[in-house]
Amino acid sequence: MSEIIWDLALIQKYNHSGPRYTSYPTALEFNENYTNEDFIRAAARYPERPLSLYVHIPFCHKLCYFCGCNKVITRHRHKVEIYLDYLEREIKTRAPLFQNRLVTQIHWGRGTPTYLDEDQSARLMQMLRANFDVSDDAEISIEMDP
């Protein structure tokens, strides 16, 4: 068996913490200087391109120490309904800005989207389909933690 040769210069080059890209634009881009008008202008760009939707589900039963996502650790399942109510308001407010764009991808991210029960998952999917033009063959994915 051949011996592993470590490139010390390469190790030292990358031996530091880097940024975590858990969203785009990154969370730091959203601040008091980013206005609703900025959002509307950004939404109007590239009207011919298909749209990808990301839905953040922040709920988890327990804390995973590796996770850097925005999360709510709770066993109070009623909080999901409150969150979905607010999410529905946001979707209804923002969806008209994208009315002529076909949704080809939907991704549910963490916390743990599997925290939602079957009815809540169906409710969320119905919200998206009712407010966006979702392609029949859209790629739909969900993050999960067994």
UniProtKB/Swiss-Prot annotation:
[4Fe-4S] cluster binds at C60, C64, C67. InterPro entries: Coproporphyrinogen-III_oxidase. GO terms for biological process: porphyrin-containing compound biosynthetic process; protoporphyrinogen IX biosynthetic process. Its cofactor is [4Fe-4S] cluster. GO terms for molecular function: 4 iron, 4 sulfur cluster binding; coproporphyrinogen dehydrogenase activity; metal ion binding. Belongs to the anaerobic coproporphyrinogen-III oxidase family. S-adenosyl-L-methionine 2 binds at F66, G111, T112. It is found in: Cytoplasm. Its EC number is 1.3.98.3. Involved in the heme biosynthesis. Catalyzes the anaerobic oxidative decarboxylation of propionate groups of rings A and B of coproporphyrinogen III to yield the vinyl groups in protoporphyrinogen IX. S-adenosyl-L-methionine 1 binds at Y54, E143. GO terms for cellular component: cytoplasm. It comes from the Bacteria. It catalyses: coproporphyrinogen III + 2 S-adenosyl-L-methionine = protoporphyrinogen IX + 2 5'-deoxyadenosine + 2 L-methionine + 2 CO2. This is Oxygen-independent coproporphyrinogen III oxidase. Keywords: 4Fe-4S, Cytoplasm, Iron, Iron-sulfur, Metal-binding, Oxidoreductase, Porphyrin biosynthesis, S-adenosyl-L-methionine. Pathway: Porphyrin-containing compound metabolism; protoporphyrin-IX biosynthesis; protoporphyrinogen-IX from coproporphyrinogen-III (AdoMet route): step 1/1. Monomer. Binds 1 [4Fe-4S] cluster. The cluster is coordinated with 3 cysteines and an exchangeable S-adenosyl-L-methionine. The keyword Metal-binding applies.
